Amino acid sequence: MRAVRATSDGVAVVDVPSPQAAGITDPVTVRPVSVGICGSDLHVIGMGPSGVTLGHEISAIHEGRPVAIQPMAFCGKCSACQRGDQHMCSVGGRRVHGIHIDGGMADELVVDAQCLVALPEGVSAEAASLVEPIAVGVHAVNKVDPVAGMRIAVIGAGTVGL
């Protein structure tokens, strides 16, 4: 199978074995359709060969329907997950597709079924790779819980915040 990985020369399409379901509770194999290139990917590439397939901003086809992929592993049961903070999961650990475990820049990807996000009618799989970066910004706004007239400062030069 083909996959995009960081190499000593930068980035290359390489042949890798089909993905395995190691450490995934309810594994589902998907075929990525569109994968965004994020600043995080550029940092991973800059660190040199990691042996991990790139890409955490992923949309795919599952059972004939387009889906977005929640890229971070989470248990769904710990106190952080129960309050909606899956990114703070104490059980799933820091396992992010494209950074710690294989990402979506490949012919196939194995993800946990709970990481599949069904898309509403009219949202294409091609556009859905932007669900993850949009979710980051929406999550930040929801955490602030702004009200009319409230002053808010956005600090940092990241593209999501801008």
What are these regions (language model features)?
Residues A6, P19-Q20, P49-G55, V96-I101, ...:
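Short Gly/Pro-enriched turn/cap motifs at secondary-structure boundaries
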Residues G161-L162:
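N-terminal Rossmann-fold NAD(P) dinucleotide-binding loop
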